[in-house]
């Protein structure tokens, strides 16, 4: 058994991937790297290596260490870059009865005023198509602020500059003070929450 030092971020990440009681860090890393889990001698060595106090020549490191470190750091980087992406509920069906293609009318889109108008038109069209499932939009939220609510005041309480607008006469309100890219992201998340596949959702949102 070899002992190495890792930084705090790597330690927390590895610990967060524990799937069962008693699983060791080696077991977790082997699973993440798709390596077979082997029985290893866990007896403590006479001398424990402290890499931070020793020469860090790459030649002296076991190649699996570099592979594991690179893999874990890549996963952490990917997760950090995706922080703005709001998770879709796990209980959402992969497909629903909603005809997402039917909600887009090029003729009606062309009559809307700016990105806000197109954003509101697409949400209104989706609301009329989704029916009672539309309340899933309430699950789409930003960091510390609401994007959808059942009242204008709720959005204003979340952000004074939210510029809330009601989606048709549905009783649902949406913030509209975001730039076009953010509106597209919000609509994409709404569509995914309602069962639309990711690629189609992005394609529809590009109409904003």
Swiss-Prot record:
One of its GO terms (cellular component) is cytoplasm. It is found in: Cytoplasm. Coiled coil: none annotated. GO terms for molecular function: DNA binding. It comes from the Bacteria. Negative regulator of replication initiation, which contributes to regulation of DNA replication and ensures that replication initiation occurs exactly once per chromosome per cell cycle. Binds to pairs of hemimethylated GATC sequences in the oriC region, thus preventing assembly of replication proteins and re-initiation at newly replicated origins. Repression is relieved when the region becomes fully methylated. Belongs to the SeqA family. This is Negative modulator of initiation of replication. It comes from Shewanella frigidimarina (strain NCIMB 400). The gene is seqA.
